[in-house]
Each structure stands twice: as C-alpha cells, then as structure tokens.
Amino acid sequence: MKFKQDFFTQLPEFYSQVYPQGITKPEWLAWSDDAAQLIGLSQPTDELLLGLSGNAAVDGATYYAQVYSGHQFGGYTPRLGDGRSIILGEAIGPNGAWDVALKGGGPTPYSRRGDGRAVMRSAVREFLVSEALHHLHVPTTRALAVIGSDLPVWRESQETAAITVRLARSHIRFGHFEFFCHSERGRADKLIQLLNFTITQHYPHLSCDAAGYKAWFLQVVQDTAKMIAHWQAVGFAHGVMNTDNMSILGDSFDFGPFAFLDTFQEDFICNHSDPEGRYAFGQQPGVGLWNLQRLAQALTPVIPSDDLIAILNQYQEALVQPYLRLMRAKLGLSAVDVPSVEQDKQDLDLIGRFTVLMEKNQLDYTQTWRQLGKLDPTSKHSALRDDFIDVSQFDTWYQAYQQRLGAVADIPAWQTERNSVNPKYILRNYLAQEAIIAVEEGNLAPLHLLQKILTQPFAEHAEHEDLAKRPPDWGQGLIMSCSS
C-alpha cells in the first residue's frame, strides 16, 4: 500500500497518535478481492497479515484515532472519538484514496475504559454487511478483511478478539463538526479548518467561501437523503443512527446491531438497546433529518441560520426522488417523462399500499419483491395473489398497479429486469449467526460461501436456494445488542 497523510498532517488537533496493539495468532478469516482493488492490493500475504493485525509496522502508515462528539439516542455526548479504531492513513488506489482503519486495533485515548477490541462476531457481521450493501448498490464504507485471533476478550461472556480492516472514503462524521462547535467552544477557526479540508478533499469543485459552504451543505443533505432512500428500498435497518455514526459523505457507516427485514414491519427494531424504537426501520427518514438539523446547528458559526433552514427544507424532496426511482424500478413502472407532483403522489400511494399489504399479510419483504420476476404483468391473475390472506384487498391494489404499469411488450425481458433490481439474497441475521457459529468451530466455509452469495445477490444460485429462505423459527426477529 502507498499512503498519503493529508488528515494527519493538516488537522493535528483532530486526533491523537496511537499505535495498535497486536492480536495473538492472527489469521485471515475473510478477504474481499474487489475491496482490495480499491487500494491497489491483490492477494492477502503473510507480511500484510502481520501489519494489519498490529504486529508489525505498515510502511507509510501514521497511526491515529480521531476525536469527535455526537448525539446518541437524542442526547449530546461532548467527547467520543475512535475508541477502538486506529487509522493508518489514506491508501492511494487506482481511482482515489481510501482511509484504512483497524477496527479492534486496541485501546486509544477515547476508549472510555473499554479494551479497544472488537469481538469476532461483530467483525464478521461488519465485513458481511459491507459486502452486502455494496453489491446491492447502497452507498457504504467497505471492509477489506477480517483477521481472527486467539486473544480472549470479555463481553457478556468470554469471546475472541478480531479486527475488521475498514476502508472509507473518509472517516469524517457529523460528530466531528459538533465537537468543534459545542465541545470546543470558541474554536470556530477549527470548524472552518475542518470544513475547508472536507471540501478540498472531497468536493474539489466547490470553493471554500460562503457560497461554497452552502453548496457543500446542500450536497451533504442530498447524499444523506439518498443513502436513507436506499436503506428503505432494500429493507435495511441501521439500528444506531447517532450523529457520530453519520458519514459526512453519505456512506453507510459504523455497523452494529443492524438487520435486513425478513417479514415486512414498518416499526421493526433491530437494536436490543432501543426498546422505544427511536431508530426503528420506519423512523430512519425522520432521524436522518433530525441528524442533519444537529449538523446544521454545529455549522451556524459559518453558515447563516436562514440559509441552513432553507437547505434543510429540501431534504424531503432529496429523499423522495431517489426513493421513487428505486421503487419504480422494483415495480417495473416506467419513468415519468415530465416530473409531476401528482404522479409522484400517486406512485407513493401505490408503493405504500403494497407495503401495507405485505405487513398485514406478514410477507417476507425480499421474497415478495423477487416474486415479481415470475409475474406476467398482463394477466388478470397474479402469481402473487396466493401469498395474500385478504385477496380482495390485493386484487384492488393489483388492478391499480396494472393500470399504472401500462402495456408490457416483452414479458420475459420485463421479468429479467425485475430480477436485476430485486435481490434474491440478503444478509439475514440468522445466516450471519450460522456463519459466526461455524467460524467459532473452526469452519470458514459457510462464511466464505455467504460472502460469495452476497456479492451476487441478484443471481439465482439454484444450488444455494436454502440461503434465500425465510428464517427458521429460532432465527425470526433476532434483535442484536450494541455489545461488540
């Protein structure tokens, strides 16, 4: 790897230098070939294993942990920071630079009495969801690898430590801006320094002046809205949408007790620590706006409040339009030639009625969309009909759907197109859990197979139909904790 060190050299007050503590008996548990290509790597090597497990220095790396704050479950925490993630720098790849971070690399000044470690189960989950989201075309950070060890760590019980090697276009979060506005009062100069760095590094088409700052914030609003639109379309619940877990670039970030929907449930909660459902699946669009409002508050020393409010008022449209585009593609609806508020409203109603029917009939979200690939949209008798208990309500919806769909000249091509946007395979929690149990038993094959399937989620993989099934009884409604 070849590194540059722009964050390290230009923002010295934004981090603490800290070196990783190596894990014992490191071994490759998983590796992403296409993530490796982003930073110019090919195959995992023994030398790389030693470096990324914290047991040897990586040439060109400067190790550091970033400081930031954030709103966690609605309350402001004035000092957070990377408690177990150590950044090596920005690795230069063929198409840009990516931060390389060792998540679980050991304690930092921000560990808050934690051990700075990640357990194997959380490392595997982060790796798999990074692969899954990327191949579902959802904006996300990436995971290069998972490195296992025999190092014991204690959570609710004894587990083994592991490291996720995370790649991110940037690790700058909403919480970075909050820290230098609220926690370090009177440091508007540092806020401006961070803003200028962010624009120069990631928005080089914008200027570092009043007009550029407003254009930048609008882009952040749009990117955040687009990310959440993708989450809602694929049925992904993040679980911990604190502002310190929000990437300034609109990439899915900091995965903990996440889940993909099995049975469709608007108020689905995937986080054991969120009994009131603040971050429930259906709440995510609203939380996205709330988090952007917190970011806007942090930017008031730099951008006038009236301008911030005007930009925030564009969030709803920035969310709805990509969501409509994604959902129209899932349903096979033709794109609207001339944008129309009325047509958007009608399509949102059609989509909403369909998901309400899914919830009422306790249907699997992913499987139901995939069934459209078997549908003859010209037939009065839908293959989907048998899945619904209240067929009269389905018939009413299906009639409206056919009317909106219009004529379909090439049915096989239409079906193929549906299968290209409606995945057959998602990272169901029970599949991740089965892979983790196998790793604990020394068997990496289920993990590697699951990774392979998740990199091709739209393919049939007829020999692996079992990975597309709804969860067994024990795997239904699994709720994960933040313990990792």
Curated annotation (Swiss-Prot):
It catalyses: L-seryl-[protein] + ATP = 3-O-(5'-adenylyl)-L-seryl-[protein] + diphosphate; L-threonyl-[protein] + ATP = 3-O-(5'-adenylyl)-L-threonyl-[protein] + diphosphate; L-tyrosyl-[protein] + ATP = O-(5'-adenylyl)-L-tyrosyl-[protein] + diphosphate; L-histidyl-[protein] + UTP = N(tele)-(5'-uridylyl)-L-histidyl-[protein] + diphosphate. Mg(2+) binds at residues 245, 254. Its cofactor is Mg(2+); Mn(2+). Its EC number is 2.7.7.-, 2.7.7.108. The active site is at 244 (proton acceptor). Keywords: ATP-binding, Magnesium, Manganese, Metal-binding, Nucleotide-binding, Nucleotidyltransferase, Transferase. GO terms for molecular function: AMPylase activity; ATP binding; magnesium ion binding. ATP binds at residues 81, 83-84, 103, 115-116, 166, 173, 254. Nucleotidyltransferase involved in the post-translational modification of proteins. It can catalyze the addition of adenosine monophosphate (AMP) or uridine monophosphate (UMP) to a protein, resulting in modifications known as AMPylation and UMPylation. PANTHER family: PROTEIN ADENYLYLTRANSFERASE SELO, MITOCHONDRIAL. NCBIfam families: PRK00029.1 (NF000658). Belongs to the SELO family. This is Protein nucleotidyltransferase YdiU. It comes from Shewanella baltica (strain OS223). The lineage of its organism: Bacteria, Pseudomonadati, Pseudomonadota, Gammaproteobacteria, Alteromonadales.
